Amino acid sequence: MRVFINAQLNSMQSNPKISAETTMKQLQELMPGARRALFAKYHIGGCQSCGFDDSETIGEVCKRNEDLPVDDVLKHLSSSAEHDQKIQINASDLKKELDQEDTDIKLLDIRSREEFEAVKIPGSEIMTADLQQEALGKWDKKTRTIIIDHTGDRSLDVAAFFIGHGLNRTVALAGGIDAYSKEVDPNIPRYRIEIEPD
């Protein structure tokens, strides 16, 4: 894997509108926590037997999963997205918190070591298994913890995991380090990942 710096990445859509015709790929781009929400309630998308193809629509997935009522699934996804918003912080609000003098914030970066070493928010730490174990077992449960990834698609799951283990002041950085670079600190280079063929 190589990390490429790129100052012209497309921005993610910020106003999710979903329908039965929305593809699963579009859904996951609009609502990064959608797979988690579908699996938690309907056992869809969590494993090979209940998976879906990115090109399938929500309606098609509902039909082949016991003909689930599409409207009910859409309401559940909307409710889940609202919950996800509550455990996110946007880049400008994070900057305000970091600029406060007596702030004790832990910035945990869950990207690969290669990504982290190429581009990082000052003061952040790469999440290792040892650091995760320390955080969950030894940190004060009131510790303000920010989970950072590349574009915000994986950090929600980790934030929910930390909250589930009692670190209730944990949030995910909405849009990840990419959003932080765009909205707060243009000195942090933007990048894209390319997987080289074997």
Model regions: which residues?
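Short, surface-exposed ligand- or partner-binding patches at beta-edge/loop junctions that are enriched
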Residues: 148-149
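N-terminal amphipathic/basic-hydrophobic helices that include classical n-h-c signal peptides
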Residues: 1-11
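Rhodanese-like catalytic fold shared by cysteine-dependent sulfurtransferases
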Residues: 9, 13-45, 51-105, 113-144, ...
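Phosphate-rich cofactor/ligand-interacting catalytic cores and adjacent structured alpha/beta frameworks
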Residues: 109
